[in-house]
Structures are given as C-alpha cells and as structure tokens.
C-alpha cells in the first residue's frame, strides 16, 4: 500500500466517491504517499478561467447518482404508508410520488453538502457548498461582475484583458470573504488558478485609489524607518554613558580597597608587637605565620616579602593614601578608626584560635601515647593469663587421667567376678578394651625406639584439647572438653625448626582426634610420662610460648577470612535483592501487557470491528500536523522564501519517519489472527491499489507539465525516470508477495481454523467440496458473491454454505430454496465423475440440505475422518510465520515510499521538491467524523444483538467449541431419534397433496360478477396503454384442467416475461387475463383494476364480501411496495399517465362504494354480525403472505375448473371445510 492511509482501501469506512468523473468507477478515494486523497481530474480544476454559465459545470458531484437507490427506497416506504390507507385513490399516490421526488432532491443535496465540506480549499474554483440553484448563482455573479466593470470604467481603468478583470474581481470577493470569515488564512492565493499573458503590461492603468494607498504606505514606512533609526541612536548613547559610569565606579572601588588593605596591615603589626611579649615572655621572637591565614593576610604577607622594587611602589601608595586621609573630614576619620579597631580585634581572635588549636593537638598526641601503652600492658597481661591457664589445664588433665585409670581398674575387677551372670556385658567390655588398646600401641613403640638423651632436651607435646582458648583479646574460642587424653614424650635430635614443624603436625592430629574417646594408657607408660613431665618442665614452657604465638597468627588469618566472607555474603545478598526486584518489575510489566491483550482479544471476539479498526489518537494527530505543515509550505512557496522552505522540508522528512511508527501500529491490528479470521469468514479479499497520481497513465499527463513549470534539466529528468522504474519494480514485487500471502492465509483460516479445529463428525458441509475449487477462488472475491454464488458452477466461485440458524440462511431461504435444490441436482449430474467417490464415502452425515436422486444413506458412524483432526502445532506455526511475513511486507512498502522520497530530494532542488509535495497533497479527504459515525452504527448494532454478532457465533469460545455447530449437533440428534431425515421425496409429496386439495375444492357462487367484469373491461379499454400491451394474446389462464405443465412452471414463465412487476403477475395469474395487458406500462392502473375486479367478484359472495375486499386491499399494499420499488423512474417521467390514473382511481372508488351499499342491503343481520367480527380481525398489519380469493366469471370459465397455484401454506389445511379456498404466496425479497 502506497500511503499512510492504506487502511482506506480495505476498510468499509471509506466509500467509493467519484468526484468529477462519473464514467470511471475505479477512481475513488485512494491514498497518496503522504496520507491524502487525490483526484484523477485534479488537473481539470484549473481549466475554467471564465466566470459564467460554465463556471460550475465540472464540479457536479456524482454521489447523488449513487445514492439514488437509497432515495427510491424511501419512496417505496412512503408509498407503503399511503397504500395502506387508500389503495383506490391514485391521486394521492401521484402526489406522494411528487413529494417523494422532492425529498430525493433534499437528500441528495444534503449528501452533496456533506462531501463538499470535506474537500480542501486549495482550489478556489471548487465551491464549499453544492450548487443548489445554478441559475440563481450565475445571475448574481454576472450582476456583480457588471457592477465591478462599471466601477473600473468610472475610475478610468481601461484596456484590461478579461482574465485580468476576473482576477481583480476575485480579489475583491476574496477580501470580502476574509472579512466575513475573520481573516481566515486558509484561503489559497489566486495566482495558482489564473495565468496571464503579460503582453499589454504597458497599457495597464491602476486606479487612483490604489496609487494613493501605495503612497501612504510608502510614507508610513519611511516615517517608521526614521523613528527606528533615532531610537537606535539613543540606545547607543545610553549604553556608552552606562559603560563610563561603571568604569568610574570600578576605579573608586579599587582605590578604597587598597586604602583598607594598607590600614589593616598597620593595625595588625601594632597589635602583634603588643601581644608577643605578654603571651610569650620566654620564647624568642619569631615571624608570625598562621597555618590557615585569611586571604587578606596572605596578600599582605606577599607584599612584605617582595623585593625592593615592590617596596618602593608600596611606599608611594602609602604616601598617596596618607594625603587622602588628611583631606578626609573628621567624621570619615572616626569611621576609619573604628574599622581599624574592628580589624585588629578580629586578627587577635584569629591568633588566639590558632594557639588553642595547637594546644589541643598536643593533648591529643599525649592521649594517643597513653592509650598505646595501656593496650601493650593489656596484651602482656592477657598473654600471661593464657600461659597460666594452659599450665593449670595440663595439671588438671594429669590428675583427671589418674582418677579415671583407678576407676577403670576397679570396674575391671568387678566385671571379672560377675562374668558368670553377665556374659553379654563382659563381651562388650572386652571389645571396648581391645579397641582402646589398639590405639596406644604405636605410641608405645615410638617411646621404646627413641629413648631420651641428655644432650637434646625432650619436647613435651602440648595438650591436644583445652577447655578455653582466647584470641587477640576480642573473643574466646571454646572447644568441647574430652573425657580422656593421651600425652606422649618425643625427643627432637634436630634443630628448632624441626620442633616447630612437629608441633604444628600435632595440632592437626589433635584437631582430628578431638572428639574421639582415647582409652587410658597402661600404668608403666603413665609413670614414665609423669617423671618426664617434672624433669622437662622448664623446657616445655618456652615451647608453649611459641605455640601461642602461632595460634595468634592463625586466629588473625581466620578473622581476615571471616571478614572477607561476610563482605562477599553481603554483596551476594544485595545482588540477589536487586535481581529479585528486576524480575518483579518485569513480571508486573508482563501482567499489564497480558491484561491489555486480554481486553483486545475480548473486543475482537465480540466482533466490534469499529473499536478495533478505528485509528489511534496518535494517527489522527500526525495527520493534522501534516496538514498544518502543508499550509505553511504553501505560504513559503508563494513568498519564495528558500530558507523557510528548506527548514520545512526537514520537518517534513522527520514527520514522514514518525508516520512510519504510527503505521506499524495500524498494521498490527490488521495482521491480528482474529481480524484475519473475521475477514476470511466475511469473504473479504485485499485489493492493493496505487494512488491515482502515481499510476503510469496519470503521470504521463501531469508530469511533463510539472517538469516544464519547474524547469527540470535533462539530467534531472533522466535520474527521475530511472528512480521511477526502480520504484515500480520493487512495488510490483511487494504487491505480488502480499497477494500470495493473503491468499494462503485466508485458505488456512477457511480450511483449518474456522471449519476445523475440534473433532466433530457433524459438519455443515463436506471438506471435499473445497478441494474442487481453484486455488485462486477458494474464497469469494467480494461479500456480494456469497449471495449470487448459488446459481454459478462450483469451479467459478465457491458457495458459502451457511448453517440454518445463521442470518444469511434466514434471509436467503425464501429466495433460493428451489434454486439451490435444482442447482445441486444439476451439478451432481454434471460433475458425477468428480464427486462419485465423494458421495459414497463422505455424505453419510445428515446434511441440512436434501440429498439428490432420492438416495437414502445410513446414519453417521462414530469414526472421525482425516480432515476432522485437531490442528497441529506445525500448522499454527505456519500461520504465525505468514502473518509475520505479511506485517514485514507492509513495513517494507512504507519504507520504500520514504526512501524514494529521500532519493528524490537529492535529485530535485528544495523549491522543486516543495512544489511536487504540494501537488501530490493538493486534495485531502480523510474525515474522522465519517469513521466515528460508522463506528457508532457498528456499536449500536452489536449492542442490540444479545447473543452476539454472526462473526462471534462462528468463532470458537474459550473451550474451543463453536456455537453454531453445537446447535446444529443438537438438531441432528433430535432428527436421529425420530429417524426422519430430510428428503426430496417428502417435499414433493407435500406439494402433490396440496395440488390435489386445490383441484378437489369447489369454486364459490358468483351472482354479480358479470356486471363488474363488463365495467372493468370498459375501464381497461379506456386506458391509453391498453392497445400497446404485448400480453393480450398470451394469457396464462387459458390452460385446460388436463394441462401437462404444473403451476410452478407457469409462474416462472410469467416472471421471465415481466421482470419489473413480479408481484403483479402473480396477482393477475390468480385473477383475470385482461389485467396482465397493462402491467408493463401503468402499474398504478393495474393495481386499481385489480381492486375493481376483486370488489366486483366479491359482490356475489353472500357470507364474507367485506373480508374479501380487505384481503385484496392488503395484497395490493404489498404489490404497491414492489411496483414503486421497480418503476420509480417511470412515474417520475410520465406525469400525464399519473394524472390519467388518478381519474380512473376516482371512478373506481365510486363504483366500489356503490357495490358495498348493494351488498349490505342483500345481507341478513346474522351475516352482518359475522362480517363485523371478521373486519375487526382484518385491522392487523399486512403479512408477507398475500391471500387472494379464486374468483369465477363468465369471461374466464376456465378458472372455475382449474385455479392456478402460486404457492402453498398451512392456511390451506385450516380452510378446507369452507366452500371457497384461500391461497397464499410469499413475496420475494427485492
């Protein structure tokens, strides 16, 4: 699609209005490259330059022609109301027809106004309202133009061309319009619509009023320029004065600052000299340097340490300051002294603060030293306490081991005595002793192999476990106490390094065996250890200090590892929290999006296409902004302001890119699966059309004119031609791809998703019927093809077979019932070689339509065919893939338009490109009010339907079930229980029975028909069109009782002969032959004649004559509907015939009243009462079935023997007992 309003082409919102070109039906509203509507005859808007009779000729709008059908329908409705009141008064009907014609004009004018208001005002010749009375407007314009010419001649303006006079006249009218509209800037300039031949420019004379105005304007401009020049000079002078004053003020401030600085220096020096001997009598004098001096002091210090050249300059400044001080008044001197005193006090306070800060720093240093000493003492105390605690623990462990050994020896002695009584306990005890004795064996062997020597002091192993261990004074490391421990003595013949390594190994072994209960050592081993403990106590004490130092280092490393672990765990927890918060935020966004999608799907399932397909607010805003941009660009082109044109073109390119994002949103709506399924069910097929201006035949017309107007060079023309061919090539490829995708998507929806989707053996129609169609005609080309496809063969266009409960079937059941039966039977015979296997294998299900050839099939089986399987995942993925490709195709087409526009901007100059854009966007016709009205109508229709729309019934619900199919399934189950399938034979039998009952019925007795028939014959011969009737000789009522043709064939022949008035033909078949003679010419006469015949025939009925009249009148009302609907044009054209008909109607009305009076006199009182009751029942509105009494007359004796049947109904069975028979037929829906 070539434009932003691509949805104009495929939406029901945008009607096909042909403006200015009634012959071309395809030139409707089409989208251009910038979201506008272009007219095929836009070039013709600038052709007429002369104001006169031909001014408004090319601007007659064609929607009035297309809307004539709707106005004729209104005429029919009016005729219905009038005919219900009086069918016999033709004068009223003719007047009503005239009124209805007037109403048609009003309706058409209103529609023309509606369309005219939406045309842009870019072309001044296009009127803003439709020309209701062209003659009146032309006279007014001619009169005003004559007055204008007189004024010009009086003012002395002569020798002007007619085009120039018209241009000046239009200028004056435009000024008048601007005054009325409130200075509206939307009116275009007149230079675009008028082209002058500047031949007699020297002969032109302007009016004196214009010259005076020009002179006044020039004087005013000169005066304004002079005033502006004076103001500019004054401003410059004021600025110079202000600058001088500021310079002087700055100089004064600088001098004052220098004076104050010098005074502060002197005061500070004096104060410092006075304060030094008092505060520091012992210290030697030093130069004062504060750690954080103020900026003023820093400046003074720099001056004090400068070289001699600076000192001389300072002396000169001091002298000047002293002279100024002498010149100052005593008041100034006092103020100066006060300022000096304040400054001196501030300097003293700053010095005091510095001294206090130094003292505080010294105190802090002393406190820190004391704290360090205290910490060292505490650490020493802690170490001593730790050593003492270890020694005490070792002693306690030795005593505890001795006590435990004694207790175990006693227990062993007691157990030896009780072996006889406690064998189980003894075995357990022995096992424990064996396990306990196995552990100390390697230790004993080690003691035996390495006896102690005098040169190497023995190293005592530390206690493997201690009850408490302190670390760094910060915390305590507690270990679980053990019941028994082992202590071994080892001799180290190596250096101190080996001892340290053995001690570390012992620590590791003790950690591993800390929780084990080690059995006690034998007595000799314990005695040896006890002796060695006292012998080497002094050497073990030094080893314990080393071990404590190692423990402290290990504790420090453990603390560091713990702190790093804590930091890592803290960082992990923080990252986890952040991750959880991000996940929660994403879940929240997904939930909101899910709710939005649920709402959209709910709307789509309801079938509210109005709300779904309505453009977004952003889309409307973009189009409005583009219209404003076009108006600004038009003004810039008229003024030839190249700078503004370039800026506006940049805005235009940006707006086009912004428009692509909005278009993608609209594309997503169309590509939605529910929307595509709905379009497929409705039989919609996309038709991609290009813009009118961008078609090849139209470009050959306006492009050369544009090239000459703008002055394109040969290089520009060649480059533009190459770009145009490339654009067309890519455009054609994208269109073919889009058509193919659309066809495949519709095919998948119709064959897989809409028809299938769940396992259901009861289907509305067989799947094989779809396979016989061509690939290009699997779905109808337009929605109207669904109603006309029943008469066509299956290979041309498929028939959309709808279920019996759907609205389409209810509307078309009365019209196409017989045709569908006949067409199905004919097609089955013709295409038997294609569907032979199909009828035998797949038509076992009970179809709602009768089966041809009278074959009876068995009930359906429970087996499911291959086509009834659920949709596979691969098929769904295929559908989604094709929908995504369709979306990409739309986006590519949009990008192609934008890229072509950008390349064209490089070929053309900005001025040329601006003119091209304005030409392409000259006419815009996108009205949001039309969209709103259509969506409102759609919403009201959907709100009135309680059960939902037809599309909603076809779509599956949440459980995957179809409502229509479920209803049909229930109906089929009921039919299966009764075992009464629908057959063609049963329908034929019913018609045969009705035909026999009609033949066997008796005709009513007619007594006064003869007089009425002669009178009716006179009326027929008096009509002007009686002799011209082509049906005088061919009367269908001349058939004999033994006629081989059935009545249905007769009605069909009459329908073929008289296409305009089907209902009147049916009435004439039931009545007289003479009435058929005037059906084609004068419809109102036929209706009146039918009324007269019925009334005359009803005079002979003694029982229900009034009832016959009323029924006939009701039937004539229905006939009036169809006659007026078919022959409005004839009534509008023949006013003389209508007047003749009205006269005949008056005569007939008098005759009918006389007949009613005669009938009432002949009737008895009882019969009158019965007639009154029947008349009350006749006040009900006319039904669709028209009841006609079968009359008998001497002119048509055949009717007494064989009345013709137009249709049968159940009312015939109720009236069998009566002497006369009523017959009804249903009027077809036109």
From Swiss-Prot:
Coiled coil: 728-753
Subcellular location: Nucleus
Region feature (Basic motif): 556-586
Disordered: annotated segments: 65-108, 180-233, 270-310, 422-578, 772-869, 1025-1230
InterPro entries listed in its UniProt record: bZIP, bZIP_sf
A single cellular component GO annotation: nucleus
Polar residues compositional bias, start-end: 448-458, 466-475, 562-571, 1025-1042
Comp. bias intervals (Acidic residues): 541-554
UniProt-listed CDD domains: bZIP
Annotated knockout phenotype: Defective in DIF biosynthesis and in DIF-1-induced stalk-cell differentiation. Exhibits morphological and cell type differentiation defects. DimA and dimB double mutant has the same phenotype.
Biased composition (Low complexity): 69-108, 192-233, 270-287, 295-310, 422-447, 476-503, 774-803, 810-831, 1052-1146, 1153-1193
Keywords: Coiled coil, Differentiation, DNA-binding, Nucleus, Sporulation, Transcription, Transcription regulation
The protein's role, per its UniProt record: Transcriptional regulator involved in DIF-1 signaling. DIF-1 (Differentiation Inducing Factor-1) is a signal molecule involved in the differentiation of pstO (prestalk-O) cells. Functions both as an activator of prestalk gene expression and a repressor of prespore gene expression.
Identification of the protein by name: Basic-leucine zipper transcription factor A
Lineage: Eukaryota, Amoebozoa, Evosea, Eumycetozoa, Dictyostelia
Protein's gene: dimA
